[in-house]
């Protein structure tokens, strides 16, 4: 019944198995990939006919994590998986990026990749396995895919690269880098690093490329057994049409792409396109060509003219040379009520970035396959349509916004202070108000400034820059701080973020083969120069974190109590802690290890809450003096509440100096008094005294008398001799 085929290799000290022919047999391509005990199913289905009216590759990728893979049941009322989590969205993009450029030009058939995590062993992250399984399924499917690709995760522990580090090793690694590509070329890099230098980062990329070669060979071996015949793609030779259109509008396009202002340039390009359309589609005549075809050739000519100009003249669309960064204006404190804010403008790209400080109550609970954890740093990126002068639908967060936000998050995460030193939940929001290239890197720069404006003690300011590449044969140009058009029409999108000490994040997407290690080295070196320049411009606004938090930010004090006292502080059903919060106005959060965080924008509220909690969680000191309140008057003395919920007895003989006939002659219920803790009787009852304490000043009269006696004795000693 089943026609199974499989291959198995040892990869990074663990078995990797790829199997097809048993599960999901009606899909065009289906592969079950197993690494350790992590298992994923990747399926590919491509429509039989091209989608009408599109000039792009209609590819969708969905990565899905099933909670049963980790032996868990989903939370919530419905107890089933809901909308995609942030990780599912990010991994879907991670898979999409290296496979998209490998489809044959002209493929317009709807193509869907679905990757399902079936088992997770809590050691091997499914994302790398998902990439490998997708590559294998595409290679088997018959879709015109110029693969296969391999992928690997690279760590850096104790100055050594580590292939596919397990989850426990990820805690100590200085690098989390994912690299994907073909046997000959790197296509995609995604990483977070702890301020590593360019040589280490490039070495990690090449290390990963070398070590996923066995995976590429394993997929080829599986394809030799089970691959379907590749589908034909009809490719039309447009050289004659290209030459014809070029003669019609070459000068118009060259002039348009010499206009530095984006909106004016787009208007000029639009006129050139209208000229072409009017030529090929005159009113009242039957057209010879499809409009989509003419538009596609026009778009191709746009790319060629921009690329020729850059390589021939060394000048870019806006007149810059290849290394110049656009003009930068950085401002901080631009919003009066925000805890921290910055406006970062670089050419026609602008980000308004706002930082908000929160407490433990604001932490985000993340429910992942490896367990539930709390995230204390959030970075959200918003890209409204007005930022590019367009109208558009407003609604849920798009995949691109999630991806760009995570890239900026990775850039800043390594420079944040440890949570135990700065116990705030941090939310950074980047509102892109203008965009013409590299808005994610503008978000990094603006976020760094906004965090410092809020008083967050970053290790060092962080900046980001987007690099591009034009490659034609032996000639190439690496471009610093690319425009949107240079991104779309170039061969590489290369984003680097970091401090003056090193790289914190690197993202690379390469659209063509043939980019060598040497070219990547040049790009990294040029990116470093640009990054240092941008940091210098940012320093004109702010060089370090502000010494004080913003006026409207909460203050948090942290201290510890014994774990066996947590129950007393919380009280039955939370009664005690609710009373503390209600009466002091402070927010209180208690961790399982006894760490207490007290937060309020009012310092007095914090002091009151801390005093209250400490009085419950600690024991009173012998011979210490406390403020107290008389809670009950008896014939033999008065009971005084003096230490949180603790009461003690002031015996009638300890009420005042001299003989006291009746307790009520000295105190009554509700009186505020000062008492000294004398000790505990045989039954553990607390003994207090009022007569040895000055009720006005709180001074210890016993200690005072003893000190005076010792002084008199010392002064009288010489006379006695």
UniProtKB/Swiss-Prot annotation:
Q: Which Gene3D superfamilies match?
A: GHMP Kinase, N-terminal domain, K Homology domain, type 1, Nucleic acid-binding proteins
Q: Which reaction does it catalyse?
A: RNA(n+1) + phosphate = RNA(n) + a ribonucleoside 5'-diphosphate
| Composition bias type Basic and acidic residues, residue spans | 701-714
Q: Which domain of life is it from?
A: Bacteria
Under the heading InterPro entries, the entry gives: ExoRNase_PH_dom1, ExoRNase_PH_dom2, ExoRNase_PH_dom2_sf, KH_dom, KH_dom_type_1, KH_dom_type_1_sf, NA-bd_OB-fold, PNPase
Spans annotated as Disordered: 697-721
Q: Which GO terms describe its biological process?
A: mRNA catabolic process; RNA processing
Intracellular or extracellular location(s): Cytoplasm
Segments forming domain S1 motif: 623-691
**Keyword flag Signal:** no
User: Which key words tag this protein in UniProt?
Assistant: Cytoplasm, Magnesium, Metal-binding, Nucleotidyltransferase, RNA-binding, Transferase
Question: One GO term of the cellular component aspect?
Answer: cytosol
Q: Which residues bind Mg(2+)?
A: 487, 493
Q: Name one GO molecular function term.
A: 3'-5'-RNA exonuclease activity
Q: Which Pfam families does the record cross-reference, listed alphabetically?
A: KH_1 (PF00013), PNPase (PF03726), RNase_PH (PF01138), RNase_PH_C (PF03725), S1 (PF00575)
Which segments constitute the KH domain? 554-613
Its needed co-factors are: Mg(2+)
Question: Do the record's keywords include Magnesium?
Answer: yes
The top EC class, named as a word, is transferase
UniProt EC number: 2.7.7.8
Which HAMAP family does this chain map to?
Answer: PNPase
- What is this protein's function per UniProt? Involved in mRNA degradation. Catalyzes the phosphorolysis of single-stranded polyribonucleotides processively in the 3'- to 5'-direction.
**What NCBIfam families does the record tag this protein with?**
polynuc_phos, PRK11824.1
The entry sums up its family as follows: Belongs to the polyribonucleotide nucleotidyltransferase family.
- What is the protein named? Polyribonucleotide nucleotidyltransferase
What organism is recorded for this protein? Rhodopseudomonas palustris (strain BisA53)
